[in-house]
C-alpha cells in the first residue's frame, strides 16, 4: 500500500511509520520540517497540513493523521481535521485513519459520560481531548469520505513494549487483564496497520488495549 503519514516526526507518527515500513509498505512522511524525520530511506512531503491539496493525497491508498498540536493550539486538531475532510472529498480512493484520543471514549454502557467528563481526568489534557472529540464529531457527520478514528487506551505509553497483541473495543473504555486501560505506542501502531491492511471499521471509531509488560 501507499501510505502517507501526517505528523510522522512525532512519537505516535514515527511508530506508525516504522511499523508500515517493517511490513513493506510504500510510506511517505508528511511533515512541516523534513529535518525532524528520524527514519532513513523514507519519502518525504514537506508541507503543512493546511497546505495539502487533493492532488497531494490522491496517490495514497491511505493517509494517517497523527497531527500534533502544541499547548495552547489544541483547536488545530479540529481545523486540521476539517481541512483533511475537505480535500478527501476530492480524493475518493484515499482512506483516512485518525490517531485519536481516549478522552471521548464513554465510561458507561448508556454512553452518557465520556472519560474526559469524569473528575479523575487530568485537566491539562482536556483541551486536547475536547478538540479531538470535536474532530470525531465532524467525521461522524461526514458521509462523503472513508475514515476510521482509532482511540488509544487511557494510558497511551510511548515507552511501552511491543507485545504484538491487543484487544479491540468500540466507543467505550476497555481494560486489559489487570483492569488497566493501557496500550503502548508500538502496539497501537500494529493496530493501525492491521486496520489499514484489513479494514473492519469503515466510518466508525474503535479503540484498543494491550497488556503492559
From Swiss-Prot:
Which parts pass through the membrane? Answer: none
Q: Name one GO molecular function term.
A: oxidoreductase activity, acting on the CH-NH group of donors, NAD or NADP as acceptor
Query: InterPro entries, alphabetically?
Result: NAD(P)-bd_dom (IPR016040), NAD(P)-bd_dom_sf (IPR036291), Polyketide_Oxido-like (IPR051606)
Q: Which CDD domains match?
A: BVR-B_like_SDR_a
**What name does this protein carry?**
Uncharacterized protein YwnB
Organism for this UniProt entry: Bacillus subtilis (strain 168)
Amino acid at each position: 500500500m501507499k501510505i502517507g503519514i501526517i505528523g510522522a516526526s512525532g512519537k505516535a507518527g514515527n511508530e506508525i511509520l516504522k511499523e508500515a515500513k517493517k511490513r513493506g509498505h510504500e510510506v511517505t512522511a508528511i511533515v512541516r520540517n523534513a529535518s525532524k524525520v528520524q527514519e532513513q530511506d523514507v519519502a518525504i512531503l514537506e508541507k503543512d497540513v493546511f497546505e495539502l491539496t487533493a492532488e497531494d493525497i490522491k496517490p495514497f491508498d491511505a493517509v494517517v493523521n497523527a497531527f500534533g498540536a502544541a499547548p495552547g493550539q489544541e483547536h488545530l486538531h479540529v481545523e486540521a481535521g476539517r481541512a483533511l475532510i475537505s480535500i478527501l472529498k476530492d480524493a475518493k480512493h484515499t482512506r483516512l485513519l485518525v490517531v485519536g484520543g481516549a478522552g471521548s471514549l464513554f465510561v458507561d454502557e448508556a454512553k452518557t459520560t465520556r472519560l474526559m467528563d469524569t473528575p479523575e481526568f487530568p485537566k491539562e489534557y482536556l483541551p486536547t481531548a475536547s478538540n479531538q472529540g470535536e474532530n470525531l464529531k465532524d467525521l461522524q457527520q461526514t458521509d462523503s469520505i472513508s475514515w476510521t478514528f482509532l482511540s488509544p487506551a487511557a494510558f497511551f505509553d510511548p515507552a511501552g513494549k511491543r507485545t504484538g497483541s491487543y484487544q479491540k473495543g468500540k466507543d467505550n473504555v476497555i481494560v486489559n487483564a489487570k483492569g488497566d486501560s493501557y496500550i503502548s505506542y508500538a502496539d497501537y501502531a500494529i493496530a493501525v496497520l492491521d486496520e489499514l491492511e484489513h479494514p473492519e471499521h469503515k466510518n466508525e471509531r474503535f479503540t484498543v488495549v494491550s497488556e503492559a509488560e
